[in-house]
Structures are given as structure tokens and as C-alpha cells.
Amino acid sequence: MIFSHIIDRFQLKFKDREAAGNILAESLKNSIKKEERKNTIVLGIPRGGVIIGSTIANKLSCDFGIIVPRKLHAPHNEELGIGALMEDGTTYLNETLVKELEISPEYIKKEKLDQLEEIRRRTQLYSDKTFDWNQNDLSGKTVILADDGAATGATIIVAARYIKTNKNPGKLIITIPISPKGTINTLKNEDIDQIEVITIPQNGNFRSIEQYYQNFDQVTDKQVIDIIEGNLE
């Protein structure tokens, strides 16, 4: 695995998601040669990862699309992810956390059904407006997964597993501006070829992705659609 940790400053704050995407794109230019970029696709995770991904794709002149995993939330705490899933049922669970919180199988089953509904809603909303990578052969291609940060890594992990299992990419790259050290260590154990991360705080210093952005406004479905349509022009 190739691992690139770009900046080591705890106080670093990105102006916004586009600024973070530009830093990642500059780093990726060193590892993806110009002639390889025609065989590369960037997949952004909605919603914030779509801004990161589209910025990278535009800078590198690559194809761009979206991939829609969903976080599985802990009971009574929507900010805490206990895992994630894809529309086909591919699931990642943080078994340690599930055990610590004594989360029942019944709760997980219902949460999966709820999140599958949201996956289908978003997929239907976005699908006719983006490059349909899911219907295209990605065998041998370089696939870049982009998000605006990885707190637990659950959505990135489940998306990576889905692509590796179903799409046979030549290379799979994870690009994230911010992720705590413990999550990076978890990602390193996955079947991923390259990780690009800008800053890695120690676990005790990390509270949320938002604290590393000056502007972390919520991204709307309309913004996602506008970005997708802009990439198709």
C-alpha cells in the first residue's frame, strides 16, 4: 500500500471542501501520470464528498461519478456511526462498538432497512444525472474514492469493499482531507492500494470533521445535482 500524509499540523483548517479537494488533487498529480488519467474515475460520496471528488476530477481531467453508501447510526446518537452499507446489502459493522453499546440485532436490522430507503432515494435522484459507473466496466481502471473526511471510516470502508468485490479495479485510492489516527490504522488493514490524507490528528484531539473546516455548511441535494450536471457539460 502507498500511504501519503500530506500535512502534519493539528491546527490546520481548510477554507472549505473545494480548498481541501485542491490540496488532494495536487498530491494525486504526483502518483497518477497524465496518460493514466483517461483510465481513472473519481467517485464522490454524497453529499460533502461530491465537492471533494468533483474538484479532484476537474483538476486531473478524469471521469467523475458518485457512489452512495450510508452510515448506520448508533441508537439515540445520529453522529456516531456503528457501520455502513451499500444498496446491494454489502455491510461493514464495527463489531467492537456494537458490542460495547450492546446494540441488538433487531435494531441493526431496522437501521439497515431505514438507510437502504435513503440510498434508493438518493440513487434515483442522482442516477440519471451522472456518469453511470455502476453499469460500466471498471476492470483495470484506477478508482479514486473521495469524501470530506472519515471519522470512523465506515462509509469509505463499505464503498471500498463493494468496488473491490464487484468491479475489479486496477487500483483503488482513498482520498480524504482529515481522519483520526485510529481510523487511518483501520483503513490500512483494508484491501486498498493507496491512501491520500492531508492531516491526521491524534484520537484524543479529534472531535469531529467539522472542526477542521472554516466553512462546513451542509451540502444539499440541489448542490449535488448542480455539481454532477456541471461535470457532464
How does the language model describe each region?
Residues 1-233:
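PRPP-associated nucleotide enzymes
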